[in-house]
């Protein structure tokens, strides 16, 4: 349109000039020059129009990229209702009274973050990076010496009472979760890098890797994970505050390098997850009982083969609109089977021939919500489980010099009852035990600590001050039973333990 107007105006001016000029002065050469000038102007107009079109195209691309970036950041439109004063959000999000938003994928952030668009930043490659973690201050008092000052598995076999106190920050966790916002051929990729500050005592804040893995998940329900994370059979967790987390008292667990394949079937109100994988080496995987510098699980050509089958379903008796009620129940089975290798014990130490030892376990676990309560627990049985915090930390017992060792068999489990009173107060109580077979432990020359039984009872109270700051208080009663051995009297040793914790979650 602009070209037509300019051409018309110019032509009108030319015609007017021609009409005003004397007729005898207009020659064929003049007409030819005018035509050439018009053609030149038309070409210039076409070039200008092409340039304008290119600029408009680039502008559209910039607008599209900006829109895509805004979608990746997952901004949430928030408005306050004039009538009810409630916060309105996009579909599939929930907002607590504190202003924290819970998305459909379970992520959480604040309205201020959504407005400023500063949460979950995207890297240049399109990777979404989410820092997380918590800082925790812990104060502990115990009536007897325990095996560790800031967390505890066992009561030490000492006569008399010696009170102990300690302060620490070692249970603090720092981590980064990363994922690709968009699927590639139906696959999405997530990962995690997480560490804590667990060290030898309350002043030793050594970095300790907890999780370090990548998980590729397909829209069909298949996923492949490689890296270090929980063993495949881990399904439920006690509510205990102590950083020992009921290890060697009914709650086996470990995080170790692995390759796992998972298939999940999702239905309208339930799901079924099948896990299978191999676990090799890593922290605590059999340890190094012969002290040859190689972990016993790594010394064997066999890896641990692990698996689990977990079914969970909506609990129809629960009120889904009550934010204080857990709405799903869970039932699962799992286990492991594999070998480790170590030298036999002789009169001069672990320098005898090498042997392979079986490590195996079967487990059943469940979690059931009942109104504001949640009842959960597990039971397991197996042998040579010291590497996964069971069998009271005992793996293989050597009863004769130069003879083959015996795998320590054990059974155990825990039960935990949690209660959520309101958004501020919650409580829990639980008990667990680990009970090795006495004959596998008694009379041992090496390889075990002579622990015949270990249990723990605890009561917890939590007070949520803000959405990311809470306090916790725990009383625990610990009891460890020892076999009689050279330089140590057998018997039961108990202790009372009180822990105060302050958590800052981010």
Task: For every predicted segment, state its role.
Residues 1-19:
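Gram-negative bacterial Sec-dependent N-terminal signal peptides
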């Amino acid at each position: 349109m602009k070209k037509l107007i300019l051409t018309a105006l110019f032509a009108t001016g030319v015609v007017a000039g021609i009409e005003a000029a004397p007729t005898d002065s207009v020659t064929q050469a003049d007409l030819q020059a005018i035509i050439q000038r018009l053609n030149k102007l038309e070409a210039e107009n076409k070039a200008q129009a092409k340039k304008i079109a290119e600029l408009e195209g680039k502008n559209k691309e910039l607008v599209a990229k900006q829109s895509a970036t805004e979608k990746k950041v997952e901004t949430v439109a928030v408005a306050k209702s004039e009538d009810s004063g409630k916060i309105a959000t996009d579909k599939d999000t929930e907002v607590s009274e504190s202003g924290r938003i819970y998305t459909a994928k379970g992520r959480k952030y604040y309205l201020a973050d959504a407005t400023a668009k500063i949460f979950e930043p995207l890297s240049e490659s399109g990777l979404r990076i989410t820092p997380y973690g918590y800082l925790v201050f812990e104060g502990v008092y115990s009536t007897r010496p325990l095996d560790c000052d800031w967390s505890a598995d066992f009561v030490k076999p000492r006569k008399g009472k010696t009170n102990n106190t300690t302060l620490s920050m070692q249970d603090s966790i720092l981590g980064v979760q990363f994922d690709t916002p968009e699927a590639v051929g139906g696959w999405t990729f997530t990962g995690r890098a997480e560490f804590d500050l667990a060290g030898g005592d309350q002043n030793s804040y050594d970095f300790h890797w907890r999780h370090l893995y990548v998980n590729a998940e397909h829209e069909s329900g298949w996923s492949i994970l490689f890296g270090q994370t929980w063993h495949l059979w881990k399904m439920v967790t006690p509510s205990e505050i102590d950083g020992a987390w009921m290890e060697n008292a009914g709650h086996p667990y470990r995080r170790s390098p692995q390759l796992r394949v998972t298939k999940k079937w999702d239905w309208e109100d339930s799901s079924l997850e099948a896990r299978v994988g191999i676990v090799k080496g890593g922290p605590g995987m059999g340890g190094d009982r012969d002290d040859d510098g190689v972990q016993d699980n790594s010394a064997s050509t066999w890896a641990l083969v692990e698996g689990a089958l977990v079914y969970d379903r909506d609990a129809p008796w629960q009120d889904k609109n009550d934010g204080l009620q857990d709405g799903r129940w869970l039932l699962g089975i799992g286990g492991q089977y594999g070998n480790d290798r170590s030298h036999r014990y002789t009169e001069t130490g672990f320098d005898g021939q090498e042997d392979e030892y079986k490590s195996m376990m079967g487990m059943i676990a469940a979690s059931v919500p009942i109104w504001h309560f949640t009842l959960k627990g597990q039971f397991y049985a197996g042998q040579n489980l010291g590497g996964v915090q069971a069998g009271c930390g005992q793996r293989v017992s050597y009863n004769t010099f130069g003879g083959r060792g015996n795998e320590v068999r054990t059974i155990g489990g825990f039960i935990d009852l949690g209660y959520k009173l309101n958004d501020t107060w919650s409580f829990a109580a639980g008990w667990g035990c680990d009970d090795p077979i006495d004959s596998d432990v008694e009379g041992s020359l090496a390889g075990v600590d002579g622990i015949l039984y270990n249990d723990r009872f605890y009561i917890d109270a939590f007070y949520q001050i803000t959405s990311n700051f809470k306090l916790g208080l725990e009383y625990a009663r610990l009891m460890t039973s020892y076999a009689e051995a050279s330089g140590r009297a057998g018997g039961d040793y108990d202790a009372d333990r009180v822990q105060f914790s302050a958590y800052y979650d981010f």
